[in-house]
Amino acid sequence: MGKYFGTDGFRGEAGIDLTADHAYKVGRFLGWYYNALRERNGNNEPARIVIGKDTRRSSYMFEYSLVAGLTASGADAYLLHVTTTPSVAYIARVDDFDCGIMISASHNPYYDNGIKVINGKGEKLEEDVIVEIERYLDGEMEEIPFALKDAIGRTTDYAAGRNRYIGYLISIATRSFKGKKWLWTAQTAAHLPLRRTCSMLWEQRPMSSTTIRTV
């Protein structure tokens, strides 16, 4: 565990432990880091980073701050909007993003929030990269240059990515559940856009012997 990032990201009370400035700097570092990584691999296209968030009021603030940091460093930001952490991990992997960012503090109180960074494989970000993010947050690195002119990153509405994840969930739902007495689905406010679509499929299936509970 580092100074800022714990076992499940950077969490704390919004505006105190985790501020808009923190989010901006995380975006600045990630945009710069993944652009530099691409350049070393002979790829001059801007880094692509996908962002999701939960329904906390502060999530919008952190989303804007992250986008500002990413685009200022020359990376392109793709917005899934309100969604779930698994959807960000899935889309980061299947749509070849450099990384994904989920803005959420999970079960923490409503006034908390968090930033979880997921690598392009849909897994937790590598520890050595987290160490470098923390060094940048603490001012232990040289200032990252700003992208200029046409190198400034773009921001894209990527609700289509969320729909792709819904399609993946539906593909799971079409498997046989014969013999199962209970199916449990987790639900928070962030799950609602996904759950509404998937629920339509459940309602159309003959599952007279199966009880579905949402928790």
Label the model's feature ranges.
Residues 39-121:
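Ferredoxin-reductase
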Residues 33-36, 94, 201:
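Active-site catalytic microenvironments for nucleophilic, acid-base chemistry
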Residues 7, 53, 103, 184-187, ...:
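Active-site flanking residues adjacent to catalytic metal/cofactor-binding acidic residues
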Residues 4, 77-79, 100, 153-156, ...:
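Conserved beta-strand scaffold positions in the cores of enzyme catalytic domains, especially
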Residues 13, 113-215:
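Gly/Ser/Thr-enriched, mixed-charge loops and adjacent short helices
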Residues 1-68, 72-73, 154-181:
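An N-terminal, well-structured beta->alpha segment
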